[in-house]
Amino acid sequence: MNRPIFIGITGGTGSGKSTVARAIFESLPEKNIAIIEQDSYYRDQSHLALEERVKTNYDHPLAFDTALLTEHLMLLAQNKTIEKPIYDFERHTRKKEFEVIEPRDIMILEGIMILDDPALRDMLDIKIFVDTDADVRIIRRIRRDMEERGRTLTSVIQQYLTTVRPAHLQFVEPNKRYANIIIPEGGDNQVAIDIMVAKIKTIIQERS
């Protein structure tokens, strides 16, 4: 079995990273493909009280266990299975359970900080930056955090102003320079997604 093709999809919070990843996933139904979310690799905080966990800046590179994520990608590159963490966003720590991920022909890694670490970045064969206006991103973030993560409107807005926006300007936006491809307007850009899928199919054909 060949080494998996690693595709990294990044961009600001609410930019449409997951939508692009899912669109690529669904456009390649005949191939073995899997998606890994960087959010699963937030550091374990079970040793902290809940009131301490909520103070963590989850939009900073240090919030992620990048060493573990890189190790897992290396194992997948060797066609070995991994035990991917499962993160509990209401309790702000990892669950005891994990998800077994087997190596596939195509592994999509999606997250806000996947281009920040050089070792992790160098493992990615294709690096995509999803570029979406800030006002669209904050609306999507509010909707997601309230509907899927049990957050209040006040807490989401406060977090955006104090950590999310500063982190985007300091870390996420500068990492755009490492991307091979920049997709404006995220999941709404079907033309860009179609081009990406065609490129992936070409790579697969060249390796077969």
From Swiss-Prot:
It holds the Pfam family PRK. The keyword Kinase applies. SUPFAM superfamilies: P-loop containing nucleoside triphosphate hydrolases. Pathway: Pyrimidine metabolism; CTP biosynthesis via salvage pathway; CTP from cytidine: step 1/3; Pyrimidine metabolism; UMP biosynthesis via salvage pathway; UMP from uridine: step 1/1. One of its GO terms (cellular component) is cytoplasm. InterPro entries: P-loop_NTPase, PRK/URK, Uridine_kinase, Uridine_kinase-like. GO terms for molecular function: ATP binding; cytidine kinase activity; uridine kinase activity. Keywords: ATP-binding, Cytoplasm, Kinase, Nucleotide-binding, Transferase. Belongs to the uridine kinase family. This is Uridine kinase. It comes from Alkaliphilus metalliredigens (strain QYMF).
